[in-house]
Regions:
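N-terminal amphipathic/basic leader segments beginning at the initiator methionine
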Residues: 1-18
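Mg2+-dependent prenyl diphosphate-binding active-site environment of isoprenoid biosynthetic enzymes
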Residues: 9, 18, 22-268, 276-286
Length: 290
């Protein structure tokens, strides 16, 4: 199981989905496709595929819901970059959506990607049955007001505060970043009809991986460079945002990231099945430069 090959399969599935003739709403789909195809690591769909692959080898069967996960993630990035949110003009090394298409179309493109993803998941559930429906609920919950959007709200209302509690910071990042990561992993296991015990273990794994991912993001915002990251750096500092660096410091965050990643590997080692590809990706996320 090659991670780069999986990324290519996800990329091709997304390109094929948006490579259709449109009429009066063509600019909407152009805007959606722009942000989808501009690049990205495809971590969330790959996590879903690798979680499924622990139990079953026919991972191509779930490329459709994996594609939907990436649409949800991309919609959140389009909205995050808007002037009323993070006001970013660079994403994945390219101008952000609203810089190319304007704010109004960018808002609608984000809305459309979320709705398109839910349509895909519902259609898939109607075809595949109860396991697909359970996976769809996990994903919908993760994207909603008690998930990713809830974390974004806490981020917004805490801008310019001198400090926030660790509990509130954990909530913000585990919802805004971690929830969709965890849902990708859990939904893959559910689609593979894993045992309840394993799903619980993978939920814990997803929680920890999401935390390590966010801490690593905070580290890269300090020590990374815009060329590698494909986006502007030092944004949190410039926007007076609290993060794990402001609470623990850079060196302690580096240690935490390593320790949490080791805990992730331990959880995977306790699961019977082919967890090696997921372990490889977990370590790559720790070592990433972007």
């Amino acid at each position: 199981m090659n991670i780069n090959s999986l990324k290519e399969e996800v990329d091709q599935s997304l390109k094929a989905y948006f490579n259709k003739d449109r009429e009066y709403n063509k600019v909407l789909y152009d805007s959606m496709a722009y942000s989808i195809n501009v690049g990205g690591k495809r971590i969330r769909p790959i996590l879903m595929l690798l979680s499924y692959y622990i139990y079953k080898s026919d991972y191509k069967k779930i490329l459709t819901p994996a594609m939907a996960i990436e649409m949800i993630h991309t919609y959140s990035l389009i909205h995050d970059d808007l002037p009323c949110m993070d006001n970013d003009d660079l994403r994945r090394g390219k101008p952000t959506n609203h810089k190319v298409f304007g704010e109004a179309i960018a808002v609608l493109a984000g809305d459309a990607l979320l709705n398109e993803a839910m349509k895909i998941l519902v259609d898939y559930s109607l075809e595949e049955g109860i396991s697909a429906l359970k996976a769809t609920k996990i994903i919908a919950d993760a994207a909603g007001s008690d998930g990713m959007i809830g974390g974004q709200i806490v981020d917004i209302i805490n801008e310019d505060k001198e400090e926030i509690s660790l509990k509130e910071l954990d909530y913000m990042h585990l919802k805004k970043t971690g929830e969709l990561i965890k849902a990708s992993i859990m939904s893959g296991a559910v689609l593979a009809e894993a045992s309840e015990g394993d799903i619980k273990k993978l939920e814990d794994f997803g929680y920890k991986l999401g935390l390590a991912f966010q801490i690593k993001d905070d580290i890269l915002d300090v020590v990374g460079n815009a060329k590698d990251l494909g986006k502007n750096v030092h944004k949190d500092q410039e926007s007076n945002k609290n993060n794990y660096i402001t609470i623990f410091g850079l060196e302690e965050c580096k240690k935490k990231c390593v320790n949490i990643t080791e805990e992730c590997i331990e959880i995977l080692s306790s699961i019977k099945g082919n967890t090696e590809p997921l372990k490889v990706l977990t370590m790559k996320l720790l070592e990433r430069k972007f």
